[in-house]
Amino acid sequence: MSKFPEKGLPREEVLNLLEDKTKVDLTFSSGKILGSMCTMPHELAIEVFARYIDRNLGDPGLHPGTRKIEEEVIEMLSDLLHLEKGYGHIVSGGTEANILAVRAFRNISDAERPELILPKSAHFSFIKAGEMLGVKLVWAELKQDYAVDVKDVEAKISDNTIGIVGIAGTTGLGVVDDIPALSDLAREYGIPLHVDAAFGGFVIPFAKSLGYDLPDFDFKLKGVESITIDPHKMGMAPIPAGGIIFRRKKYLKAISVLAPYLAGGKVWQATITGTRPGASVLAVWALIKHLGFEGYREIVRKAMELSRWFAEEIKKLNNAWLVREPMLNIVSFQTKNLRKVERELKRRGWGISAHRGYIRIVFMPHVTKEMVEEFLRDLREVLK
């Protein structure tokens, strides 16, 4: 058990201790992490984050330049998502963004026993949101292709429904729900639709421009009232950098509370976290400005092409098969004796994700063809 030290250690000794204690950690540079939705941040983002690490957007009056840049980031993300004027923040991640959306829907609704309809494929952050906010979660069934059954969503709408959730890039399979149909449904019943595009938000716009056949998912659809989009996933920003964008200012106002004591002056604060790293915002701004649409499209092109190649290789194996054809840069497959296969692959050092009966590989920017070929060699040996 560690005790608070009476005397400090020399700087180099502390760094050496840290190096030793973290040797067991997998790193993105190791070439072994294949199951994470995060990646090694872009080198420019690392430089910017380190340079502005003291900025605190929890007290924006002290950092008006950083506050203005956050507004520009929200404007650029809104533009990417086909919204002329959006309202939101860069937050700690998709979990906080999803909780904020549910909180906004609940606060605006007058339902006595609020309910949220969401797919069975939805992220666990909504379970947290339901517990924290006193919102009952009503789970909609999935179709055979693992997208939400829109008819089941409609069947579960009631007077207590405060919102509907659609997923643009499910955690396990990368499935994009039929957001256009959900949008039509939301408009018909006058219910706001939240799209969790924590992963897909930095993939789908660029993949569609490359010719991939993917459904619309963003503010182009009039029923969509809010979107979660995470720059610290395919956006290559440093952790933490999630994003929440609302179509209308009323949602942001509905979750804002007054913080009157701040050194920079009183401010209305909508995020869950008070202290909030401005460095994350500045890194996101720098990346978007540096890479632009063309830069991100190239990142997505490589990821999508590699994922399709891998899917075809899985089809060649006797004892492994795809769960479904990939929609985004996520490929999930099943095997005989799955738990045994998973244990052996992890014993060989692979950082993979196995849940709900399949192994998931996420083709993030740090994943190379050489890495995947090595993984396939190990997989073939394990499957023998």
Curated annotation (Swiss-Prot):
Q: Which GO terms describe its molecular function?
A: aspartate 1-decarboxylase activity; pyridoxal phosphate binding
* Keyword Lyase listed: yes
The prosthetic group or cofactor this protein requires is:
pyridoxal 5'-phosphate
Gene3D superfamilies in the cross-refs: Aspartate Aminotransferase, domain 1, Type I PLP-dependent aspartate aminotransferase-like (Major domain)
Keywords on record: Decarboxylase, Lyase, Pyridoxal phosphate
One GO term of the biological process aspect? carboxylic acid metabolic process
Report which reactions are catalysed by this protein.
Answer: L-aspartate + H(+) = beta-alanine + CO2
Q: Quote the PROSITE patterns the UniProt record gives.
A: DDC_GAD_HDC_YDC
Q: Which residues carry this modification: N6-(pyridoxal phosphate)lysine?
A: K233
Cite the annotated pathway: Cofactor biosynthesis; coenzyme A biosynthesis
Bridged cysteine pairs (disulfide): none
Q: What is its EC number?
A: 4.1.1.11
Among Pfam families, the record links this protein to: Pyridoxal_deC (PF00282)
Q: What does this protein do?
A: Catalyzes the decarboxylation of L-aspartate to produce beta-alanine.
* NCBIfam families xref list: tyr_de_CO2_Arch
The record's similarity note reads: Belongs to the group II decarboxylase family. MfnA subfamily.
Q: What is this protein identified as?
A: Probable L-aspartate decarboxylase
Name the species this protein comes from.
Answer: Pyrococcus abyssi (strain GE5 / Orsay)
Q: Which gene encodes it?
A: mfnA
